[in-house]
Amino acid sequence: MSENWIDAAARDEVPRGRRDRHQYRRQGDCLYEVAGEIYATDNTCTHGAARMSDGFLEGREIECPLHQGRFDVCTGKALCTPLTQDIKTYPVKIENMRVMLKLD
């Protein structure tokens, strides 16, 4: 089985050093910087049709802008109600200053 890595963004397109808007939206996924590392999740909340790229990132937690549920962006784990389902995460690597995502 071959690996399916896609070029998601330039590394410098994922904002650094701010408490909000750490995320970068690319179609159906969302990129985040946490402590210098890049993480990727689906861009749609598992609870409702809210875009995670419109949420608020604090540390490792992204808060859904619709119902304030929070996910750990590093693991995808749903951390509080009303969330009952984890969010999908994607493996990330940096190649030639490009953020690459491994899709299933």
UniProtKB/Swiss-Prot annotation:
The molecular function terms of the Gene Ontology recorded here are: 2 iron, 2 sulfur cluster binding; metal ion binding
Q: Which cofactor does it need?
A: [2Fe-2S] cluster
Q: Which PROSITE patterns match?
A: RIESKE
In this entry, which stretches build a coiled coil? none
Q: Where is this region: Disordered?
A: 1-21
Look up keyword Flavoprotein and say if it applies.
no
Gene3D superfamilies attached here? Rieske [2Fe-2S] iron-sulphur domain (2.102.10.10)
Residue span, Rieske domain: 5-101
Q: Which InterPro entries match?
A: Rieske_2Fe-2S, Rieske_2Fe-2S_sf
Recorded hits in SUPFAM superfamilies, A to Z, give: ISP domain
Disulfide bonding pattern of the chain: none
Q: How is the cofactor bound?
A: Binds 1 [2Fe-2S] cluster per subunit.
Membrane-crossing ranges are: none
Annotated GO biological process: catabolic process
Pfam families per record: Rieske
UniProtKB keywords: 2Fe-2S, Aromatic hydrocarbons catabolism, Electron transport, Iron, Iron-sulfur, Metal-binding, Transport
Q: Where does [2Fe-2S] cluster bind?
A: C45, H47, C64, H67
Quaternary assembly: The 2,4-dinitrotoluene dioxygenase (DNTDO) multicomponent enzyme system is composed of an electron transfer component and a dioxygenase component (iron sulfur protein (ISP)). The electron transfer component is composed of a ferredoxin reductase (DntAa) and a ferredoxin (DntAb), and the dioxygenase component is formed of a large alpha subunit (DntAc) and a small beta subunit (DntAd).
Name the family.
Belongs to the bacterial ring-hydroxylating dioxygenase ferredoxin component family.
What does the protein in this record do?
Component of the 2,4-dinitrotoluene dioxygenase (DNTDO) multicomponent enzyme system which catalyzes the incorporation of both atoms of molecular oxygen into 2,4-dinitrotoluene (DNT) to form 4-methyl-5-nitrocatechol (MNC) and nitrite. Functions as an intermediate electron transfer protein via a specific interaction with iron sulfur protein components (ISP)(DntAc and DntAd). Also able to convert naphthalene to cis-(1R,2S)-dihydroxy-1,2-dihydronaphthalene.
What name is this protein filed under? 2,4-dinitrotoluene dioxygenase system, ferredoxin component
Q: What is the lineage of its organism?
A: Bacteria, Pseudomonadati, Pseudomonadota, Betaproteobacteria, Burkholderiales
